[in-house]
Amino acid sequence: NSLLPLPVKQVLNNHNLKGMHNILGNLIEIENVYSLAISTALGASSSNIVVDNSECAKTAIKYLNDEKIGRVTFLPLDTLKPKEIDIDTKNTLNNEIGFIGIASNLIKYNSLYSNIVSNILGNVIVVDNIDNANRISKIINHRYKIVTLNGEVLHVGGSITGGFNKTSNIITIKYELENYIK
């Protein structure tokens, strides 16, 4: 975890802080074929720390402030609510060429984290390529984020992000290491 931001490392390594689980990226398993799409969908959330409750987050934030270490985003198990795609849109998507699935359904995780995973990925659509992503985005009126297997993003409202990305996050590094070991 040497690639984690320093404040995240400091919090995770401080054994006086109770209720810290891990960073989200370490609490999920992703098939290699989906790793770029999911890591793109997660973005900085992959380094957010899952905690038991908002009190644990407050205690950790006090520590970060007192020590002037930096900022961290916490995902409290007791407050995050699931997000999902409405049933009509799901039915539409199921008939569309290129639709792969909802991001939260393409990964494995302990059911304890289902609200958190659903909050971050439950309304993100994964599609095979940018052409199908563009077409599907228009059909659903740009109401949901769409990511492609190559990591392009069609944002809510219609803006598009893409191109080569040489930065890595915890997910892509985890899979590069696994492939290297194989």
Q: Each predicted region: which residue ranges?
A:
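Hinge-like oligomerization/junction regions that interrupt long coiled-coil arms in large cytoskeletal
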Residues: S2-K182
